[in-house]
């Protein structure tokens, strides 16, 4: 999954893709580099972000989604916490809704039920962020949300769960979560992880956020060996190659 932020305050893109024509060209490049889907966001979710209005978020997304649909660029995912934005995006041909809030909008499940789209459910309990997290607690929280979705008519086969790296716990805890990710496979949903350029990688990289792609590729390759289905990244070409190496290693191990 390639990342395309059309926000002026992205933590690593610095507003490079706010102009619709530049954003569409970047979407084309991400697919050319090997992305299976491109995730477009109109509201920054970096630490300390300032929420934007529904209209402002849609004004950023609409021209890009319309142009992508017109040019046959896809499949497209939209990164939003708002059910109304999700509904409008689906009307524009979006295939997946990526919700970092973990169903905080009470109308989101209804919007999903009315479509056949995919949905990314992130572990993101509301309230104060703690430094640590238990994989057992994460499992229970996600299981509850999956049950809510099922009761609303959204099948688990349409859902990817995301452990929320960089969102719901301290920097050091990201490493522990990654080490224990296989425990989440028992939930029956696919698994998506977004490690790209995040702050926990600064513990092993001296590069600024915009240049943490080598570290991102390394952790993405490791994730591929743990049963992760999708990695959400900025530098698709580099990560695609790293994951291909990991996949070959896993295949060789299974043959042996």
Model-derived segments and their meaning:
Residues 1-2, 29-41:
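N-terminal glycine-rich anion-binding loops that anchor highly charged ligand groups
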Residues 155-159:
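Short acidic capping loops at alpha-helix termini that bridge into adjacent secondary structure
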